[in-house]
C-alpha cells in the first residue's frame, strides 16, 4: 500500500511516516543521479589507465601539429 492510497491525516505517526517516505525518495533520486556521474568517472579513469598501458614510445611521439607541417602546407599553396 502506497503512502498516497489513503487520505493523509496529520497525526504525529503519519508525519513521521511521511518524513521517512520523503527521505527514501530523496535517497533513491540521489542514487539514480549518481549512476551517470560514476559511469562518466569510470570512462575518464579507464581511458587514463589505458593511456598508461601504452608503450613508452607512444608517450614520446612528436606532436602532429608542429611548425614544420604548417610551413610545408603554406609553401605548397604558394
From Swiss-Prot:
GO terms for cellular component: plasma membrane. The keyword Transmembrane does not apply. The keyword Membrane applies. It is found in: Cell membrane. Keywords: Cell membrane, Membrane, Photosynthesis. It holds the Pfam family RhodobacterPufX. Associated with the reaction center - light-harvesting complex I. May play a critical role in facilitating the interaction between this complex and other components required for light-driven cyclic electron transfer. This is Intrinsic membrane protein PufX. The gene is pufX.
